[in-house]
């Protein structure tokens, strides 16, 4: 499953600019226990931002809910409304690209603006036939 953050951004812009503006404000994202002593258990970042002229998108609703709980900073009614709109758009079948990967297929995507996911699958019992996936990050040095 693939979905463009630009598409979501522009749909929210058309539907409710005030809610889009809220998504440019910072939210607490839970670090899921991956922090050192003395560090914050959350990252405080916006969902949408433009960085170096490019749209960047970060969103995991459960990380935001947990992050605000950890920081004891409840989400406002308008923040919840903005996140609900975002949740609905990320499930909109009209804007999701579905692609059935075949053995040997390779996918490259930019995690800063392409949302990605997968549907459920049943794996083989035979170790030689089990699903294999190699995930790597390629850094753009420009």
Feature map (PLM): residue ranges:
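Active-site environment of non-heme Fe oxygenases that use a 2-His-1-carboxylate facial triad
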Residues: 1-103, 108-142
């Amino acid at each position: 499953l693939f979905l463009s953050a630009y598409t979501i951004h522009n749909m929210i812009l058309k539907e409710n600019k005030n809610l889009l503006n809220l998504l440019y404000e910072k939210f607490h994202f839970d670090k899921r226990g991956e922090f050192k002593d003395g560090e914050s258990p959350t990252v405080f970042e916006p969902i949408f931002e433009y960085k170096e002229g490019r749209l960047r998108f970060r969103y995991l609703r459960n990380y935001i809910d947990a992050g605000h709980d950890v920081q004891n900073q409840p989400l406002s009614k308008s923040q919840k409304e903005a996140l609900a709109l975002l949740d609905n758009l990320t499930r909109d079948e009209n804007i999701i690209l579905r692609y059935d990967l075949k053995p040997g297929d390779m996918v490259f995507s930019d995690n800063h603006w392409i949302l990605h996911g997968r549907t459920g699958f049943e794996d083989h019992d035979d170790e030689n036939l089990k699903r294999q996936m190699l995930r790597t990050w390629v850094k753009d040095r420009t």
